[in-house]
């Protein structure tokens, strides 16, 4: 059967880099995206096709249950999932407490952020597993950050979501281990992506990372994609339930 990589958040940043690198490694690509213009998607599709693999990009809300089931039904007709990447970056950036009457997080903000960036991993894996699309050797990756353990201004809801994502990844790793399916969270170093640029104080974060990373630079989406592709080709599930830091040493010095 044909082997596919399913990528949520495939149109930019780490998701797009993973789509390209996995295509280079021979994976067919099924990308889910929400906002990028068609011209960007066309460019990605052209590059992926040039690697001699199949590609489908679908514009949809990954949290919409009907759309998710529609995607699963489509995937069942295509083959099996050997790599699943959860790389959704969409959350509310507000403080928890008000100073000078500034807007603060409310219950809808927190619930939405946790569901989109955290809990949705579980919902997708449940459907993939139920549909027998996950097989021995499948690699599942969730994209976390040091924000799951460290606090930044206005990052509270996203930080909560990352903690949920890591916990869900560990639990899924336990429940899928006997099937030879690995689940790991990837903690990238500070990476200059559209998602990072939305975080208040991002320029200070970038400069701090550059100044303190022993490798002397920021992490790039391609850094992450290279390791994701390498692991995805291994067919080995013994490394599972981890938070894998890919950051040039940033975390141990920061």
Describe the function of each predicted region.
Residues 89-178, 190-191:
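Catalytic loop of short-chain dehydrogenase/reductase
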Residues 177, 182, 239-241:
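Short, small/polar-rich loop/turn modules that mediate ligand/substrate recognition or access, typified
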Residues 42-43, 157, 178, 185, ...:
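A glycine/serine/threonine-rich, flexible loop-to-helix segment
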Residues 213-224:
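A conserved structural motif in NAD(P)-dependent oxidoreductases
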Residues 26-42:
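Conserved glycine-rich Rossmann-like NAD(P)H-binding loop of the short-chain dehydrogenase/reductase
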Residues 229, 240-254:
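Short C-terminal tail/terminal secondary-structure segment
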Residues 48-66:
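Rossmann-fold cofactor-recognition segment
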Residues 11-12:
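Conserved glycine-rich cofactor-binding loop
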